[in-house]
């Protein structure tokens, strides 16, 4: 299942930017997971979000402060997480906006525990209450 067609031409890149509100000053590059380390050393101001985090996880630009705070809290890079992580955090952020709540990464950590899997790096698992 490839998604390179979303970013393969200037027209498809323009429609991707429009559909997901990606600003012009955000550089988009489609690369394989194995090539991320090569691109990481080219710039200190580069952050890698998996394409699926945008497509399925709800990541939008500018990146939500709750996502940034949660990544800092767990000490993780965006490319270490599956789309489900972003979906959970994006839903909590949406609840904050709709109902005027002030939920943060501590509330997420209260409900979910961060687990590690060899294949998918890290993921959130609901805690047994």
Language-model-detected regions and their locations in the chain:
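Residue-register detector that marks a fixed positional context within folded domains
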Residues: 1-129
């Amino acid at each position: 299942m490839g998604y390179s067609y979303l970013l393969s031409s200037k027209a498809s890149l323009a429609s991707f930017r429009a559909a997901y509100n990606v600003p012009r000053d955000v550089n988009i590059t489609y690369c394989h997971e194995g090539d991320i380390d090569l691109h990481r050393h080219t710039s200190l101001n580069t952050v890698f979000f998996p394409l699926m985090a945008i497509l399925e996880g709800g990541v939008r630009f500018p990146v939500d402060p709750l996502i940034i705070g949660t990544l800092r809290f767990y000490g993780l890079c965006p490319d270490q997480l599956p789309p489900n992580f972003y979906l959970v955090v994006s839903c909590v952020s949406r609840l904050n906006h709709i109902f005027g709540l002030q939920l943060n990464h501590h509330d997420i950590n209260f409900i979910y525990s961060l687990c590690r899997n060899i294949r998918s790096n890290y993921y959130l698992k609901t805690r047994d209450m």
